[in-house]
């Protein structure tokens, strides 16, 4: 059976070099279905040197070629990440698909493929070094016309990029902070605020972020999210707590003093709510933030005495 599959895959891959666009399209359609429905075929497709040929199709103006190519690469990334990363031109092709997608589906699949590759820690600095990829992901988030699914996959990819600390400054430079806070303020679609604030919390862990946070009115946004009156989910509140705590840990007393000067009772109440009712990780971070901010509240004192 394996021999038969290999032969079938080899024949399909050979068709990707055809001068006929119809032949290439038909082969890509079959490879997409095969890689989606048959997990065993994925390594066979990758080993047949199909990846560079599939990636070339991302430069085609034809919607059907771009869609089938990005979907196939996404399927292959499930189990053949090393093949994708070692294949010439794949990251550049994905970058092109992010910035010049023939359809929203292409942008979504390209972002999802990047996110899949970022699950391997060793790939994060490599992908983070590709400025065009980060720029493309940020533009998807920035563009109010982007489909919700595309934005979600772009946010997940940006989160993966930000997990490598040395990538964060470049994200700030390429406008990620402004795009993320703008999304939080203007877009109420379920799940997007949670994902956006998760990225903000990661980006907050670099020295370059604080001044940009202030220029983007991000501090006010984070404090509004902590206000119980806004009805933010606990995940959003915990991300806001992490953002402030990470900023203080990186920026030291100067940032801590800045945050203290902006602190209001409503915000302290929100942090206390996380300390009392959040996840274990959220509770720990909320208590750490309250301690750094030198909060004076009987509930905080009760929580700290209980935790000690």
Language-model segments: residues:
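Buried hydrophobic core positions in alpha-solenoid tandem helical repeats
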Residues: 11-13, 53-55, 90-98, 136-141, ...
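Eukaryotic N-terminal low-complexity, Ser/Thr- and Lys/Arg-rich leader segments
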Residues: 1-4, 308
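The feature encodes a structural signal of leucine-rich repeats
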Residues: 42, 55, 81-85, 95, ...
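Alpha-helical solenoid repeats of the armadillo/HEAT superfamily
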Residues: 19-33, 61-77, 87, 99-118, ...
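Structural recognition of alpha-solenoid helical scaffolds
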Residues: 4, 8, 40, 49-53, ...
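Eukaryote-specific detector of the first structured module of a protein
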Residues: 3, 7-83
């Amino acid at each position: 059976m394996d021999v038969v599959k290999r032969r079938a895959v080899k024949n399909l891959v050979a068709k990707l070099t055809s001068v006929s666009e119809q032949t290439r399209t038909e082969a890509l359609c079959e490879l997409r279905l095969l890689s989606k429905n048959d997990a065993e075929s994925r390594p066979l497709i990758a080993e047949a040197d199909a990846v560079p040929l599939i990636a070339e199709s991302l430069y085609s103006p034809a919607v059907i070629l771009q869609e089938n190519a990005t979907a196939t690469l996404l399927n292959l990334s499930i189990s053949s990440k090393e093949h994708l990363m070692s294949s010439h031109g794949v990251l550049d092709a994905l970058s092109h698909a992010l910035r010049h997608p023939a359809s929203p589906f292409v942008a979504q699949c390209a972002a999802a493929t990047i996110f899949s590759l970022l699950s391997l820690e060793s790939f994060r600095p490599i992908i983070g070094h590709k400025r065009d990829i980060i720029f493309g992901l940020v533009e998807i988030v920035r563009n109010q016309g982007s489909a919700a699914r595309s934005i979600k996959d772009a946010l997940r990819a940006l989160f993966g990029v930000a997990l490598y600390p040395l990538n964060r400054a470049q994200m700030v430079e390429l406008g990620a902070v402004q795009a993320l806070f703008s999304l939080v303020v203007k877009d109420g679609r379920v799940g997007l605020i949670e994902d956006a604030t998760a990225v903000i919390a990661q980006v907050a862990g670099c020295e370059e972020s604080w001044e940009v946070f202030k220029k983007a009115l991000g501090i006010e946004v984070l404090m509004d999210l902590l206000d119980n009156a806004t009805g933010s989910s606990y995940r959003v509140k915990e991300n806001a707590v992490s953002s402030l705590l990470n900023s203080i840990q990186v920026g030291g007393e100067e940032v801590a003093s800045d945050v203290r000067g902006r602190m209001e009772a409503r915000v302290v109440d929100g942090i206390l709510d996380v300390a009392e009712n959040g996840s274990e990780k959220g509770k720990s971070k909320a208590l750490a933030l309250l301690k750094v901010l030198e909060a004076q509240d009987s509930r905080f004192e009760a929580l700290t005495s209980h935790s000690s």
